[in-house]
Amino acid sequence: MEGSSNSPDRQSSGGSPPEERGGGGSGGGGGRSAAGEPVRSRWTPKPEQILILESIFNSGMVNPPKDETVRIRKLLERFGAVGDANVFYWFQNRRSRSRRRQRQMQAAAAAAAAAASSSSPSANTSPAAASAATVQVGLPPGAVVHTMAMGGSACQYEQQASSSSSSGSTGGSSLGLFAHGAGASGAGGYLQASCGASASASSALAPGLMGDVVDSGGSDDLFAISRQMGFVGSPRCSPASSPATPSSAATAAQQQFYSCQLPAATITVFINGVPMEMPRGPIDLRAMFGQDVMLVHSTGALLPVNDYGILMQSLQIGESYFLVARPP
């Protein structure tokens, strides 16, 4: 009778296989479990523990090895009792849920693709393709029109063969944003970006943009490419106010190019599984998140702070962190 009365307790004690294999004996097994550590109910992680586990899983560690499991368990023990087996089975169940959700998303995507393919073919024509078809009207023979996305809008650029005598001239409504220099004695090619600019603006800008590449003799000039990418001058200056000499124009463009290469002031990191823009360098953790919190890396390492609540090391781009409350 004693063994049968203890059997339900063993079946509801967390579901670990060692306890279930040990519970098939007689009443002596129940006596050992009663004499040792009391059998607890199924482990229910606390919100802080769930947050830590989810952050570690989302960082890419979906199947931690044994030593990492021990580290995670020690980190979770700050907020409640937990064992290595609990951590192991949590990651096992989380992987199963993730795979099941991925299969459901793939099935939904396949159904949506099948529904889209069964619709009328005329609906598949995109606005960019339609605009490309309109730009092709009036192009010279041999011109190839491509579609290119720039700044959220669709632009087309034509690749046109040209000789050294005609490489400096451009179309009436084209801006030479990308160019490949033509040799002094051979034929070359350049790319003209047709972004809907007016004829007057393009006629003023195109010679300055293409002249640097033609003068370079076909060599790869990084500063000329940077000037063609939009670093010709200040946006407030008109094209007519640019210097007349190529050397002074090149110097001004180089200075403008280097002045635009400042590092980003913020970086993107994941905090509690949410992408956030954080300042680069030292961070005032107390002023940003409060007094009683600490920042932990997804590997379980606690980020050190000084006496004033300032992080001693900078956050890394793309890394995953999570905020946890300090234990009382």
UniProtKB/Swiss-Prot annotation:
UniProt-recorded Gene Ontology molecular function terms: DNA binding; DNA-binding transcription factor activity
Main subcellular location of this protein, as a coarse class: nucleus
Region (Disordered): 1-45
UniProt keywords, alphabetically: Developmental protein, DNA-binding, Homeobox, Nucleus, Transcription, Transcription regulation
UniProt DNA-binding residue ranges: 38-102
Sequence ranges of Polar residues compositional bias: 1-11
Location in the cell: Nucleus
UniProt entry tagged with the keyword Metal-binding: no
Pfam family, one: Homeodomain
Classification via SMART domains: HOX
Gene Ontology biological process terms from the UniProt entry: adventitious root development
Source superkingdom: Eukaryota
Protein name: WUSCHEL-related homeobox 6
Taxonomic placement: Eukaryota, Viridiplantae, Streptophyta, Embryophyta, Tracheophyta
Gene: WOX6
